[in-house]
Amino acid sequence: QNAEYPRIIEAIKEGLERWPQGSFAVWYPIKQRRTLQHFLRTASKLPARTLLLAELLIRPDDSPLRLNGSGMLLVNAPWQFDQVLSPALASLRAHLGESGASHRLEWLKAPA
């Protein structure tokens, strides 16, 4: 898994070179969120207008042996997409989450 992240960054870079205004979505599993830090730091430097991070953990990310949640990196996300995702993530957490469930919605690059 971790070896795939540099390839994902390169693929997004290539996509943005060909289509700078294009929207791209990358799904990723979350076993332990701390393993994603380098990927997200690198992604935040991409030459995109906006970068939106949406994550749902159905349980705490304290075990690398199971899928604890998943995330989406949205490159050049549609306008006000965060306002659509916020209630959806809260609803999913309420219906699917176990004790310690959480969600995160964060602009790595906010709209200007």
Per-range role (PLM):
Residues Q1-A112:
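Class I S-adenosyl-L-methionine-dependent methyltransferase catalytic core
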